[in-house]
Design a protein with these regions (language model features):
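Nucleic-acid substrate recognition interfaces
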Residues: 1-189
Length: 189
């Protein structure tokens, strides 16, 4: 039997400088703003009956134009902005899945300060790299991290930075091999 990996996520506290903390807040604020603007755009498309343009790929394709029109979004890594669009698309997919299942759907919500408090680098190594006790985030800088337990396995996507319990933290996903599996002694039932 081939060994399969197990995905495990580790959460660590960040120790940013005051300037880095301010940059992290600005990135989260801009990501939340982009999410809300994209949600408003989809809502307008839907009300006008132009639902053919309301897709992740359409909105993702508009990001370069947004960065040209609003240079402050150019200060954020492109994959982080694309992940914001993916978050919104997943919210709509869940909405339509519930509609089709006959459940109470719950239209995707506009995100306030307390509801949208993180951002994600979808690819490890492309914008986010851990080097010892320092996390390098593209266009943000090198932030010290409190490694209170060792990381196991090889890096996987989704280094996610945000705020939890009043402090800033990062979640790092890792894939590690399992050297043992429990096999059942007898057939279930």
């Amino acid at each position: 039997m081939e060994h399969q990996g197990v995905r495990k996520t580790y959460r660590y506290r960040l120790d940013p400088t005051p300037e880095q903390a301010q940059v992290l807040e600005i990135v989260i604020w801009r990501c939340r703003t982009l999410y809300n603007v994209a949600l408003e755009q989809r809502k307008l498309w839907w009300e006008r009956g132009q639902d053919d343009g309301a897709s992740y790929y359409q909105q993702k394709a508009e990001l370069p134009g947004l960065k040209a029109a609003c240079p402050e979004f150019g200060a954020i890594h492109a994959h982080v902005l694309q992940d914001v669009m993916l978050r919104l698309d997943r919210a709509f997919q869940a909405f339509f899945r519930r509609v089709n299942a006959g459940e109470t759907p719950g239209y995707p919500r506009f995100q306030g300060r307390g509801r949208y408090n993180s951002f994600t680098f979808p690819e490890y190594g492309n914008g986010a790299v851990l080097d010892g006790r320092v996390l390098s985030l593209s266009k943000i800088g090198r932030i010290h991290i409190r490694l209170h337990r060792p990381l196991e396995g090889r890096p996987r996507p989704l280094p996610s930075a945000g705020k939890r319990m009043g402090g800033r933290c990062v979640s790092l996903a890792r894939r590690r091999r399992c050297n043992h599996f429990l096999a059942p002694d007898k057939k279930p039932g």
